[in-house]
């Protein structure tokens, strides 16, 4: 299993409508790309205050590394990636491979 963690430092002018559109794109991925087990997204709720400007994030859980590797060049990934780049000043990606 691979957890694909993506953190976004949002631009100051990002609207709730834009974030809702982004969440909708993400939510549709499991039905469109084989090997995606789940998608979760939202703003940070951590009380620690250690986000360093990364106030929004999403987590895509893949069945395995092959599924993650198929997702990256997949045509359904492109709109997600493009919108993330529009919404964010900075993007941080961190993948964690674990056994079930």
Label every model-predicted segment.
Residues 27-33, 76-82, 88:
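A common structural junction motif
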Residues 1-55, 63-73, 96-100:
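Short S/T/G/P-rich N-terminal loop/turn motif that feeds into the first structured element of a domain
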Residues 84-100:
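Charge-dense polyanion-binding interfaces
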Residues 61-62, 87:
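Conserved catalytic core of Hanks-type protein kinase domains
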């Amino acid at each position: 299993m691979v957890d694909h963690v993506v953190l976004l430092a949002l631009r100051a002018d990002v609207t709730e409508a834009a974030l809702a559109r982004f969440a909708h794109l993400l939510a549709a991925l499991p039905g469109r790309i084989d090997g995606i087990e789940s998608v979760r997204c939202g703003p940070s709720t951590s009380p620690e205050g250690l986000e360093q400007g990364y106030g929004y994030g999403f987590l895509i859980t893949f069945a395995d590394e092959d599924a993650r590797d198929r997702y990256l060049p997949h045509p359904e990934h492109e709109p997600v990636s493009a919108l993330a780049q529009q919404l964010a000043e900075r993007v941080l990606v961190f993948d964690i491979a674990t056994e079930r």
